[in-house]
Design a protein with these regions (language model features):
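C-terminal catalytic subdomain
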Residues: 2-22, 26-134
Length: 134
């Protein structure tokens, strides 16, 4: 295989967006809605969303208040929380994990999580008012 064989895509991003890249150890064990909730809780815990919710966050980021130093310190914690949740779910025999749901759709009897290794790379898009968001 060559690098030119790879699939690529592009997505428009904005300051304040969270990008999560991970192995199947995360996505087989943690539902996308739960990943979103965890990311939102992380934003609230570290003060990226306060006093007005997401609208206030977007206004603050648009005005150039990116909190980039705090983000650099806090973003590893989000990856850690997600990995921990994946491990917890992988060991839960009663959970209908994303893997279990897909298995059942394909007539494979599976319940619980899917024991697997997990790697998560979490990124927080930051910059100042004059930065391009491309």
């Amino acid at each position: 295989k060559e690098a030119s064989d790879s699939c690529t895509s592009s997505v428009h991003i904005l300051r304040g967006d969270i990008i999560i890249m991970a192995t199947d150890g995360l996505f087989d064990n943690v539902d996308i809605d739960d990943i979103t909730k965890i990311a939102l809780q992380w934003e609230q815990e570290y003060g990226f969303i306060d006093g007005g919710g997401i609208g206030a966050r977007n206004k603050r980021w648009a005005s150039g208040h990116s909190l980039s130093d705090l983000s650099a310190q806090a973003i590893p914690k989000l990856a850690e929380i997600l990995c921990r949740k994946a491990r917890e779910n992988s060991l839960d025999n009663t959970l209908d994990s994303p893997f279990a749901l897909l298995a059942k759709e394909n007539d494979v009897m599976w319940s619980g999580g899917m024991p697997d290794d997990c790697t998560v790379l979490a990124m927080h898009v930051v910059g100042n008012k004059s930065s391009s968001s491309r």
